[in-house]
């Protein structure tokens, strides 16, 4: 491909078909199955913990399923909101906003389902602090996504210009050794904020729901 000067993903290169098949199997089907497995595993784990706890009743066992259903509906609405947001100039911002829309709908649906007050008895009778923990966890997840976008993207995140990728590109001018060193240093540095966020999320969730 390089010697003949054929562009990337050109149909004249027979290897493109195999490459696209691999992309779909690994990046789409494989990643989707992995996310689904993690999602279902977390729901089942929460249900087992609730079932084995003497302080929690049947409502706590049903809560992960109910919140998962609300999350599904919110995610579908968030995906379809892309048809409205895609007309903007910033594609990255549009994708980011779909996440925010889905998260807000999920939080609203979760609180309405659990809240005992003006709306009367919630669908299930659980402590509202548990929902605070759920919201905190989703906030941490979104924040980690924004940090990842900062360290792996080239577009500004909420007006903050990323310096990681341009720095690696600048270091690459002097050779592969500095490229590897810069990439390794940025990669290691990029894990610092997510670690702090996860730790804060664990302590916060224990405070609200523990």
Set out the residue ranges of the language-model regions.
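Hydrophobic packing and interface segments
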Residues: 1-210
């Amino acid at each position: 491909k390089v010697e003949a000067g054929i562009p990337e993903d050109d149909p004249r290169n027979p290897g493109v078909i195999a490459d696209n098949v691999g992309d779909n199997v690994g990046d789409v089907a494989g990643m989707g199955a992995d996310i689904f497995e993690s999602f279902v595993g977390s729901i089942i784990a929460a249900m087992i913990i609730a079932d084995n706890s003497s302080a929690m009743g049947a409502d706590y066992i049903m809560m992960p399923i109910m919140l998962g259903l609300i999350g599904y509906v919110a995610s579908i609405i968030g995906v379809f909101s892309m048809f409205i947001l895609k007309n903007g100039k910033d594609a990255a911002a549009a994708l980011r906003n779909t996440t925010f829309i889905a998260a807000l709908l999920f939080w609203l649906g979760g609180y309405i389902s659990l809240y005992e007050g003006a709306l009367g008895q919630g669908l299930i009778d659980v402590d509202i602090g548990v929902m605070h923990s759920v919201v905190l966890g989703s906030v941490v997840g979104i924040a980690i996504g924004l940090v990842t976008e900062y360290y792996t993207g080239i577009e500004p995140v909420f007006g903050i210009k990323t310096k990681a990728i341009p720095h690696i590109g600048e270091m690459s001018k002097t050779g592969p050794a500095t490229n590897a060193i810069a990439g390794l240093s940025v990669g290691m540095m990029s894990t610092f904020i997510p670690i702090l966020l996860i730790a804060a999320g664990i302590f916060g969730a224990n405070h609200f729901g523990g």
